[in-house]
Amino acid sequence: MNKLSKFALSCSVGFLFFFSLNVVSQEVEEVVVTATKKAESVQDLALSIQAFTAEDVSENMIENMSDLAEVVPGLIMDKGIGSGASYSIRGTGSYGVGAAVVGAVVTASNGHSYNSSSIADIGFFDVERVEVLKGPQGTLFGRNAVAGVINMITARPTAEAGGYVELEAGNLALAKTNMHYNLPITDSIRTRLAFTSKKRDGVTENVNTGNMFNDVDSWGARLSMDVDIGDDSTLKFTYETYESDDNRNNIGTSFCEPHPLYGCSPFTLGTPNTAADSRGSTAALFNLIGALNYTADKNSYEGAAVVDTFKKANLNREPIHQQTADFATVEFNHEINDEWSMVAKYSYATRDYFHMNDNDYSVAVQPFPGLIPTTGIPMSWYGCFGGEGYGFCETVDSDRTYEFSVVTTDSQQGEITFISDKDGPVNFVLGAYTLDSRNNNRYQIQTASWNMIAKAVQHPYNVPVFGGALTGYGGTDFFLAMVLGAPASLAPPGIFALLGLPKYEVPTDIQGFINEDHVRSKSMAVFGEMYVDLSEVTKLTVGLRWNDNTVKDSVASCLTFFSCPKYPLSQKLTGEYGFFPTQVTESDDALAYKLAIQHDLSDNQMVYASYTTAVKAGGNNPNSTGTPDPYAPEETAVFELGTKSILMDGSLLFNAAYFQNTTDGMLISSIVEAGSKNNNVDANIDGFEGNAILFLSETTRLDFSWLAVKSEIGDFSLINPLNPNGATQLLSPVINADPQGIVRYAVTDAGVIFKSAGSLCLAPFNPAGGVPCSNPGILTDVTGNQLPQSPELSYSLSLNQDYNTDGGVTTFRLTYRYQSERFGDVFNSERATMNEHKYFDTKITYQPNDANWFVSVYGKNLANDQFVGTWAAGSPLQGGNTFSTYTDPRTWGVQFGTSF
């Protein structure tokens, strides 16, 4: 028995023994959930689940997924690079990158998948319940539920007319509204309209412009209708829409310790809001190619202001964040007879997403000197960034890097389920499910030099030096020939004719790095669970699901026309952007199953053991060349021992589980040049988790939930793209291998390392000259390392105290939340270690005895500490910085709610 197993057993036995004493108290309430496609108490289910009623959601101040992650130990949620969101449960989650990658955690609304990024923004308004199912849920929830399910169950209409409104105001000019209204039309038709809106000022100051950003401006609405069709059938309709338009962060900042060779030191983390040393980077090379500089050995960010705090930033522009999402569901419930019922469900969802970030997280103060500094011509022009239908234009006189993400998705799901309720010992849930989704995802990085290279007409040298001869030309082929390859004695028109270069300009969409991914995903499944009462106190569950998944990935990646092999000359000559993808189709089918046995020790105590599996579909890697590079499916199996207990005459709820998770082919992403590669890695995760509710008296309650987990990567090695030879220090100064600094190198304590166009190599190379890298690095053994985003300990402890008076009840709640330090990469490097998180939250609510209103005051993050949320490694092409999200500062406010 390992240490974690002994710890789990000791805690369980000790906890139950300690609280076997009598405590005068009221009884805990059981929560009814639909985790098995039918209504059952949490206490009767042989699986680990935390469920929050509408009252729990309000009490815990769970407004969105980020709040839920604070309340549920081991649940980690954060935004990712691009348009996505990453989730992990129990120390395992979504470590893959790319539009074709499905998450390891299913986020759902009323049982059907909901885009994980959309639901993170929308949050929880007018909900009946939020269920967090931990561990594989492959038999009932399908193709990617390898780590768990987060299911939001929305409130349904009632038979009585009436409504509720809640108003909230707080610091940062917070103004929030939640309301709903029930309107029965007839005895058999009921409707409910819910609405939410939130506005909040920004929490971060841009010291360059003086503007505040990272604000919130969003609203959402939901229409629900239930129609009784006879005595045995009900038709349920739900339509939800959401919109946000603000300047909130996607990725919050960039950490870097500027380094003359690497860009950012791979040895130390550095400070936030710090740009990489641009010498030898992709941007520096293209500054030279674009005739904006006479060398690639120049740091554009030397002398740039650094603000070492999350509360401030130094940006050319504040971020833009826009999202609209719609989700509609039609559900038909029919009682076939006394023993069988049927549920047929169809849902349709759409999403439009856009964001723009200042990707270098700094403002360069070094002007461009030009290819010929002696001319004295200012290097300044008016350039446009973005793409067709989005973006902006501005005066450009120094380095800058912008990021754009544009996404449109639509999906439809259909499901039919048959549920038995027989008097005999055997019952069933049987069903079929289908999914068809389309995801068009565009991700772009654009710099000043790439903007210049797109259209030579905007170059400051065009008229005074070349007499306008550059007009109509553009692209890397032209600029490479003009700057690096042409005889100096020839006039420009003669050079172009001699080289036979075609005349075209580069569309704004492709003036930089662009990865455009059109993903079509189809999934079909049949599933079922059988429940066998072996005796009055023992129950066996057997589940099985067959999935058939197909992912068609049409992907095109270009680094301007410098690396864009499939883009034809005929399209270049049109001056318009075209999509010329490589198509990859990955198909696989898989079985997932579940075996569970549970035994009632008494009416209020149950123990169980289960073995469950789930499979996540394979796909294609988003590499920088757009070539096919598939990855395999991810298969997870978990053995779990647990208990569900209500003790001490109903005053104590104690649920706990010990689990052993084995995953074959877990996706671990690594940066490769401008793209990403998802590696299939084996991993093991052991953990002990649980939650307890204890009434110490009629007016005093303790809530405690926890997770202790140990994760370990299996036998695997990969190249560290930020430190390819595993060096710990430089032993020589950085040396230019050519007069223009296109190729640079230095001696480290692990050998010589070369750099050009941002790429690192252990052998001489020159991407601009057509000489590729022959030795990209030495494999680093990560066997036995801890998984990223897997803190070893996290818990939440709350004290609830009611004060009763003749006029009403005042409830005081104080919560302490803790999460131990964790690693942000598979190398478990010190620079990627995230510090422990500690929060205190409080809420005080008054509710009169003879009225239907309440008033609350609350404070979150009382110590006003801000922590790193997640890490995301930047590409060496940009200098190897570390992107980071960060948590909100202290917030406080007042709430008033009333029903009518």
List the model feature ranges, each with a label.
Residues Q26-E160, L641:
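Acidic, small-polar-rich N-terminal luminal/periplasmic segments of exported/outer-membrane proteins
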Residues V102-A104, S116, F125-K134, T139-A221, ...:
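Outer-membrane beta-barrel translocator/receptor signature
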Residues T204-M212, N249-N314, D360-F404, Q446-I514, ...:
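Solvent-exposed loop segments that connect transmembrane elements
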Residues D228, F418-D421, N427-S437, F466-G467, ...:
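Structural signature of Gram-negative outer-membrane beta-barrels, strongest in the C-terminal barrel
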Residues D245, T253, S405, R438, ...:
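Surface-exposed extracellular loop regions of Gram-negative outer-membrane beta-barrel proteins
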Residues E331-N337, S341-S347, D352-N357, D600-K616, ...:
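Membrane-embedded beta-barrel scaffold of Gram-negative outer-membrane proteins
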Residues N439, I445-A454, L702, S711, ...:
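C-terminal beta-signal and adjacent terminal beta-strands/loops
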Residues E536-L540, A657-T662, N679-V826, Q895-S899:
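Gram-negative outer-membrane beta-barrel transporters
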